[in-house]
């Protein structure tokens, strides 16, 4: 999967990720990056969590962007990253956003000991389904070992 977008290095400690990722989303929309990224595979927006120092309790990188078919043109100020195929366990956050996503992540963290996560990368996929008010849905994919 090839992604072009913007990123931030953050941590879940002391609520830092909530602020950093919220600021990243604000930047993504205020700079109208969806419209500026060429060669889009779709209009789905991905929030990818990668470069884990160890696990969800340690620093990691969040990238917000879109899947592209090629890296032939990467706009200034954006970055391109390619992610390998891996096995995922899918979770679906349902309800008002972003609260539903936050609640699902809490469930994932609470289940960490049994998920057998890879910590290579995980991602959320935002589509038209994620903009339906209290009936919104966001798919969350957690990388797991086979």
Which residues fall in each region the model found?
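A solvent-exposed interaction/effector surface
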Residues: 1-146
